[in-house]
């Protein structure tokens, strides 16, 4: 968090102010944000303009108090408050123009320069799209019911919120598509041969539309038809290795693993729901009974959609008909499923699409339709984000599919995300700032009252004027919103206290202690997280101001104490002149600052120091996060927050607030100390000036504290229950507070929620001087309403704003969705790159994915590469749009994981899981993948590891003349061939005619390569042989007799074609022998076994006569058809047709959407690919954004005007 204004040193501060003064004289603009400098010659305090910046979200990064980046901007924000639409425009001065657009209140007041309202508006009434027009929503409200909420006695008040009905739009992550997209599709190769002219039977127009795509794919002359990944899947295969570096280029298991990861992410993030259009056909024009009267407008492709056309080859049609005799196959709309009110939910459709895409469509639709969010859940969600005295009612939910914002193990995923991706806190803070800024609690005045008083007071001590001149600097609404929001934002690293000269030994040094006390009263959570630094500064001042007390204090209490077995052990200070370091961690370890001990003897040993500590300590108590728990937001056991303020239920200024009493006491005590301790420094006139300053500060404190207790108190009650604020803030016990102790622990590494160590967060710099700006430079909503602040102190009687939940429900749900997505990605990485985590029932599939990847070989940098690769798939955006871009940055603590656990860590010691202390979900490895995402992941796993897994092991090099190439032919080495497992012991030399030749040494006999016969050289590992050995082997297979080189462990990806025009025989035997064993070779195989005779095209292929590279394993599992031609009107012997598993539509489990074969076998349990399935198609009126009306009746206003 940036300070109000940061300078490297006083010289820079003076220079910068001088430059800005010159710039201001050149800019004649009206402004209301001020900064103050002291004129070098007049002794007066001049006012000059500064530019402020408001947090914004750009390129996935929040520029707010958690970053040092700033950007000037003009934005328009709209806050719906009951019937009001309160719009403010922030200009470059940070001052808002506020327009109250409520129907019965027409007031406009400006606090600064007015800019054009050009930016996106938040909180405006959403546009109602066709799925829920205004007439529908007007009817929806008729079913509203009152939620369970304690109703306060109604009294006659001026309400700005009564009987309000708002529309809540729940933006879902599901999307629709009317054109089915397969994950697997047919690919056909046409043979280029001389063949008899094919005969086509005529078909009518309707049949031509229905059958033509399938006739083109399975036409006469087709050599082979095989299954390939569709373009949307295949494009994910990396061109180069991006994750796991290898020593060679080309395709490797690293590429393959990265491809698997990308496909799993693609499936896991998929939320597409099919909404097909249909048309009716004349049944009399179609002879196939499997084709139903209502069919999709997008025609599918399948052998089943050509078999009744009587188109050549007829034998193929007849063979398919025989094949499917006992199978369940239908094309088109099978039935329509209605709900209890006879409203269409979805159509059950038979369609040629692979079972994986069909299952994914079905799963998405059923998840969407099955989101059973109960009425009380919606009520709890709205209440969690609402003013506590709003009586909530909502409309009927019967036709609404509201996205769930809760699931099992949410807390684990939130904790994991914060530990491993700490930048997420920026988004948490951005949400809090959005909320607080919309409340418009503070406005900035045109001049600072403290400066004004000092400017006009002739009795003021010059050192005090200079001190305030130094401390009071820029303040704007952005800074104010930042600081107040930080009280509820989880702080995960010790903030850095802004450095400056504390003027030790001078009276003004006690003003700095007063500043720290006032800051602690207003911001105890931030204070708690930098308590060590604050103590160091207080003791540094007291070392000179109250030296005797200081010496007694450190002699008895030291700087720190530990708690051992429930007892305090104070650490003695050896050197009484030693200054306490600000860098010691008193937040996460077992050190506590002694100044804030609860030891009762402190007041007798060092009464002044005890008084300072007492003034700083919070007096309020913890409030349970009951509404957050009811809304099913992630929370720890006994979750609570400290609201630093106390409720103020009386309008007007006749009763001082509790916070005012504390601040009054602090000002009174510290000024008495100033006058007492530095009596010799003040003559009579300066002493009177100090008294007048004290009186002014006391006067300014009252309206500020009215706002804190009367308005901000209620804002904090809402913010404490927001989803993102799941980590408790301070408990108010400065003597014993420990930050959240949970951490992700893995293989001896600890990644904490709250980071420890002596390093401070340089990006979260706190300047406690904000208290002087709040006192002297602001008006506030509560004060304006009752006439304590504002223009001429005239009461406006406009209720302070409590933002309505409209603007925060969607960001809240999307934040949860984004964390689920990022944790799911991490879950995928753990599943593949770690062998210690499995999915029950999917061990075999995961083992296939892990081939070639062993955990010790996956470095931390490679893990980071994997995250970055996936990040690029997710895209970027803020919490309203897309998964969080920056969450996958790994510069901080993200590292390679093996089997992470969430555990408490005390004093760097990992604590065991304790059932009555720790959440149950922390007992085992966190479930990073949400259950619905797990189903999508399992679908991808099955697709990747079944017949579509095209990596084959085992090749044989053997040169043989071939009339035809048949990919179904697997080379088998004859039994009479001797197999030698090749080693360097089988290589020798022989000298002839004074020339040394390399030869083979087989059975003790030296043999030239050309003389080798009936030998199989088994090469278990490639890429390790010297050049002369490779040369010998190649000469043996080229010139020897019946010689083989078998490579049982070599990996390759076969590509098959029957089209001679596509065949590129680029793989050389030498390359196979010299390539590293991790390489996966891409080898094209030519299939021309069905040529009726050698054609001129075939003879033109230079290597068609000889074949050297042979597969020793089956490579044809993807081939679905072969040889669609006639041999004298009959089926050629080498021709192939589909298997039943490909064409068996079967049925589905309508509970889960999982495809099932006619036999009852689940298709996910088979390695075979089914290209005809039952898919669910939703009606266009079913898939729509949920829109409900809610009404909030305010039973008690913020201010109860008399």
Swiss-Prot record:
Role, per record: Inner capsid protein that self-assembles to form an icosahedral capsid with a T=2 symmetry, which consists of 120 copies of VP2, with channels at each of its five-fold vertices. This capsid constitutes the innermost concentric layer of the viral mature particle.
Pfam families to which the protein is assigned, alphabetical: VP1-like_C
Family: Belongs to the turreted BTV-fold inner capsid family.
Protein source organism: Aedes pseudoscutellaris reovirus (isolate France) (ApRV)
Location of region: Disordered: 1-45, 73-99
Name of the gene: S3
UniProtKB keywords: Capsid protein, Inner capsid protein, T=2 icosahedral capsid protein, Virion
Comp. bias intervals (Basic and acidic residues): 10-21
Sequence ranges of Polar residues compositional bias: 27-45
Chief localisation class: virion
Record-given protein name: Inner capsid protein VP3
Quaternary assembly: Homodecamer; each decamer is made up of two conformers of VP2, called VP2A and VP2B. 12 homodecamers assemble to form an icosahedral capsid.
Disulphide linkage map: none
Note: Function inferred by structural homology with BTV-fold inner capsid family.
InterPro entries: VP1/VP3_C
Localization (cell): Virion
GO cellular component, one term: viral inner capsid
């Amino acid at each position: 968090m940036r300070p109000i204004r940061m300078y490297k040193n006083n010289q820079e501060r003076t220079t910068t102010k001088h430059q800005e003064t010159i710039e201001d004289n050149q800019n004649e603009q009206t402004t209301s944000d001020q900064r103050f400098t002291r004129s070098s010659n007049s002794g007066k305090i001049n006012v000059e303009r500064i530019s402020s910046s408001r947090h914004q979200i750009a390129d996935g990064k929040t520029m707010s108090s958690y970053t040092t980046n700033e950007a000037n901007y003009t934005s328009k924000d709209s806050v719906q408050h009951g019937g009001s639409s309160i719009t403010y425009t922030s200009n470059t001065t940070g001052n808002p123009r506020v327009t109250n657009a409520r129907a019965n209140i027409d007031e406009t007041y400006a606090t600064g320069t007015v800019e054009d309202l050009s930016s996106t508006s938040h909180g405006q009434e959403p546009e109602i799209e066709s799925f829920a027009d205004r007439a529908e929503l007007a009817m929806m409200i008729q079913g509203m019911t009152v939620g369970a909420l304690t109703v306060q006695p109604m009294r006659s008040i001026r309400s700005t919120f009564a009987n309000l009905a708002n529309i809540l739009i729940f933006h879902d992550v599901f999307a629709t598509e009317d054109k089915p997209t397969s994950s697997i599709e047919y690919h056909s190769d046409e043979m280029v041969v001389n063949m008899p002219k094919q005969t086509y039977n005529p078909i009518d127009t309707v049949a031509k539309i229905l059958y033509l795509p399938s006739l083109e794919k399975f036409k006469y002359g087709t050599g082979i038809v095989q299954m390939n990944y569709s373009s949307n899947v295949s494009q994910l295969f990396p061109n180069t290795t991006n994750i796991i570096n290898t020593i060679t280029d080309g395709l490797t298991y690293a590429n393959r693993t990265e491809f698997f990861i990308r496909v799993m992410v693609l499936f896991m993030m998929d939320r597409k729901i099919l909404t097909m259009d249909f048309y009716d056909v004349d049944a009399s024009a179609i002879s196939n009974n499997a084709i139903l009267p209502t069919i999709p407008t997008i025609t599918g492709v399948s052998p089943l959609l050509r078999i009744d056309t009587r188109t050549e080859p007829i034998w193929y049609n007849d063979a398919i008909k025989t094949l499917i005799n006992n199978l369940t196959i239908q094309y088109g709309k099978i039935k329509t499923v209605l709900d209890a009110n006879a409203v269409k939910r979805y159509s059950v459709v038979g369609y040629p699409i692979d079972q994986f895409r069909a299952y994914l469509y079905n799963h998405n639709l059923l998840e969407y339709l099955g989101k059973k969010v109960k009425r009380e859940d919606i009520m709890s969600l709205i209440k969690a984000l609402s003013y506590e005295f709003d009586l909530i009612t909502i409309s009927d939910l019967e036709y609404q599919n509201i996205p769930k914002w809760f699931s099992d193990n949410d807390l684990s995923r939130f904790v994991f995300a914060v530990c491993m991706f700490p930048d997420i806190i920026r988004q948490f803070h951005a949400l809090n700032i959005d909320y607080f800024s919309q409340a418009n609690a503070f406005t900035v005045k045109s001049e600072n009252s403290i400066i004004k008083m000092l400017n006009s007071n002739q009795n003021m001590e010059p050192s005090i004027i200079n001190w305030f001149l130094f401390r009071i600097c820029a303040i704007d609404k952005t800074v104010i919103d930042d600081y107040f929001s930080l009280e509820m934002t989880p702080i995960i690293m010790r903030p850095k206290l802004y450095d400056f000269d504390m003027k030790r030994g001078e009276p003004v040094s006690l003003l700095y202690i007063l500043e720290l006390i006032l800051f602690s009263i207003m911001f105890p959570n931030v204070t708690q997280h930098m308590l060590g630094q604050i103590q160091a500064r207080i003791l540094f001042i007291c070392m000179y101001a109250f030296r005797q007390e200081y010496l007694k204090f450190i002699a008895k209490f030291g700087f720190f104490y530990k708690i051992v077995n429930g007892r305090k052990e104070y650490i003695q200070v050896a050197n009484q002149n030693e200054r306490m370091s600000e860098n010691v961690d008193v937040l996460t370890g077992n050190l506590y600052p002694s100044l804030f001990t609860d030891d009762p003897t402190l007041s007798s040993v060092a009464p002044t120091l005890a008084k300072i500590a007492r003034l700083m300590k919070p007096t309020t108590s913890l409030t349970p996060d009951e509404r957050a728990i009811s809304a099913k937001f992630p929370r720890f056991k006994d979750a609570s927050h400290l609201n630093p303020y106390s409720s103020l239920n009386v309008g007007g200024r006749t009763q001082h607030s509790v916070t005012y009493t504390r601040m009054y006491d602090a000002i009174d005590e510290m000024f008495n100390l100033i006058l007492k301790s530095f009596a010799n420094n003040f003559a009579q006139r300066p002493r009177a000036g100090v008294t007048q300053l004290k009186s002014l500060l006391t006067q300014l404190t009252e309206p500020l504290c009215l706002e804190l207790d009367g308005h901000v108190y209620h804002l904090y009650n809402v913010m404490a229950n927001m989803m993102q604020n799941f980590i408790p803030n301070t408990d108010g016990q400065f003597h014993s507070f420990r930050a959240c102790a949970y951490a992700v622990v893995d293989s001896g590494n600890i990644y904490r929620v709250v980071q420890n160590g002596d390093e401070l967060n340089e990006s979260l710099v706190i300047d406690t001087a904000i208290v002087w700006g709040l006192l002297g430079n602001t008006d506030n909503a509560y004060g304006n309403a009752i006439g304590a602040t504002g223009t001429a102190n005239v009461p406006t009687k406009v209720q302070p704003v409590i933002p309505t939940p409209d603007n925060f429900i969607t960001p809240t749900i999307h934040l949860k969705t984004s964390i689920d997505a990022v944790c799911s990605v991490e879950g995928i990485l753990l599943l593949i790159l770690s062998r210690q985590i499995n999915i029950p029932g999917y061990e075999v599939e995961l083992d296939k994915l892990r081939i070639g990847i062993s955990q010790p070989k996956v470095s931390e940098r490679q893990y980071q590469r994997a995250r970055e690769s996936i990040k690029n798939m997710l895209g970027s955006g803020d919490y309203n749009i897309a998964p969080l871009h920056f969450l996958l940055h790994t510069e901080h603590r993200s590292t390679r994981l093996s089997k992470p656990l969430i555990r408490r860590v005390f004093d760097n010691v990992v604590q065991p899981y304790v059932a009555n202390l720790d959440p149950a979900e922390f007992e085992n490895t966190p479930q990073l993948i949400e259950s619905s995402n797990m189903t999508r992941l399992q679908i991808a796993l099955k697709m990747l590891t079944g017949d579509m897994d095209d990596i084959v092991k085992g090749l044989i090099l053997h040169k043989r003349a071939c009339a035809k190439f048949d990919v179904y032919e697997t080379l088998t080495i004859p039994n009479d061939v001797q197999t030698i497992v090749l080693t360097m012991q089988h290589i020798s030399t022989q000298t002839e005619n004074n020339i040394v030749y390399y030869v083979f040494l087989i059975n003790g006999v030296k043999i030239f390569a050309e003389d080798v016969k009936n030998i199989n050289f088994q090469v278990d590992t490639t890429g390790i042989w010297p050049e002369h050995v490779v040369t010998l082997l190649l000469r043996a297979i080229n010139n020897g007799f019946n010689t083989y080189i078998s490579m049982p462990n070599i990996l390759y990806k076969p590509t098959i074609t029957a089209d001679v025009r596509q065949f590129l025989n680029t793989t050389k035997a030498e390359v196979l022998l010299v390539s590293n064993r991790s390489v996966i070779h891409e080898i094209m195989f030519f299939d021309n076994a069905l040529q009726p005779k050698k054609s001129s095209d075939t003879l033109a292929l230079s290597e068609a006569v000889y074949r050297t590279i042979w597969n020793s394993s089956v490579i044809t599992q993807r081939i679905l058809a072969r040889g669609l031609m006639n041999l004298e009107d009959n089926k050629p012997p080498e021709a192939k047709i589909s298997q039943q598993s490909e064409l068996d539509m079967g049925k589905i489990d309508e509970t889960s959407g999982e495809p099932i074969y006619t036999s009852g076998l689940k298709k996910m349990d088979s390695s075979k690919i089914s290209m005809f399935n039952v898919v669910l198609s939703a009606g266009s009126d079913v898939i729509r954004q949920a829109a409900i009306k809610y009404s909030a009746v305010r039973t008690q206003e913020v201010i109860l005007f008399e």
